[in-house]
């Protein structure tokens, strides 16, 4: 797994990956990857370009099937071979491109592919109520109308709609791919507040990010991937920015180990 720079929380992880391998022809994308994602915690997944973050995320989301290893969901071994398998467990993903249709309104986007029917017709009133409730629960208050097209929304509003769409389906784990990419200061704050609210609702949250300011702003835990291997994971308080950069670029760091020891945590390899 790499270096464990702290003691694990007492709660059982909602999701665990153990010894996960994934290759594409001769290219080994993931090697013996372990990962723990806990309910009510935000785990920041960090790594340089090509480190394996997106491949790992897509394996958890059911886009790619792992070659070796095992996933566990709430302590039980599971197989995630398709996005439908992931959705059944309660795993939802918000990709960097958001997968929103600009020409459709907010309600239509939130129910795209999962429309509710009544007597063979779209149950518009029910979908509007559900969309409004989800946005209200997440305290998304900046949209003018749930019937405005996504094309008319700001970047932060679009991200909020994509997140609301992900949590609407009884999700228990939400994965966010670079949720603040290309956003301004105000919009970034809005999205990070939204990420915190997901945690406060008891969801397990995994946030892929290159922005270490965002990582240390919201993350409870940090996991770092280097060349397809998980080289470190633990409490965010056991890292500093330089140690994360060291792990991302070289796969090792002495700084986090010193900090972990100062915190009374354990370190080692397993």
Residue spans of the language-model regions?
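Glycine-rich phosphate-binding loops of nucleotide-dependent enzymes
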Residues: 2-270
């Amino acid at each position: 797994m790499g270096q464990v720079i702290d003691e694990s929380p007492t709660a059982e992880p909602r999701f665990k990956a153990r010894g996960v391998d994934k290759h594409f022809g001769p290219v080994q994308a993931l090697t013996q990857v372990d990962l723990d994602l806990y309910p009510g915690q935000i785990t920041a997944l960090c790594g340089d370009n090509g480190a394996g973050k997106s491949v790992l995320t897509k394996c958890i989301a059911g886009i790619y099937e792992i070659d070796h290893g095992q996933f566990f969901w709430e302590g039980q071994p599971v197989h995630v071979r398709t996005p439908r398998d992931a959705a059944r467990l309660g795993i939802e993903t918000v990709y960097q491109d958001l997968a929103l249709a600009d020409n459709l309104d907010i309600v239509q986007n939130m129910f795209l592919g999962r429309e509710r029917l009544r007597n063979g017709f779209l149950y518009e009133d029910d979908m509007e109520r559900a969309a409004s409730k989800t946005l209200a629960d997440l305290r998304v208050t900046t949209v003018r109308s749930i019937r405005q097209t996504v094309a008319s929304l700001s970047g932060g509003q679009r991200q909020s709609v994509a997140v609301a769409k992900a949590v609407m389906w009884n999700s228990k784990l939400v994965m966010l791919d670079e949720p603040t990419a290309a956003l301004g200061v105000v919009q970034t704050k809005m999205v990070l507040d939204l990420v915190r609210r997901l945690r406060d609702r008891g969801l397990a949250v995994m946030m892929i990010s290159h922005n270490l300011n965002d990582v240390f702003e919201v993350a409870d835990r940090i996991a770092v991937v280097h060349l397809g291997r998980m080289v470190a994971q633990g409490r965010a308080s056991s890292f500093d920015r330089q140690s994360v950069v060291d792990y991302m670029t070289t796969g090792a760091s002495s700084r986090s180990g010193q900090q972990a020891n100062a915190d009374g945590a354990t370190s080692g390899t397993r």
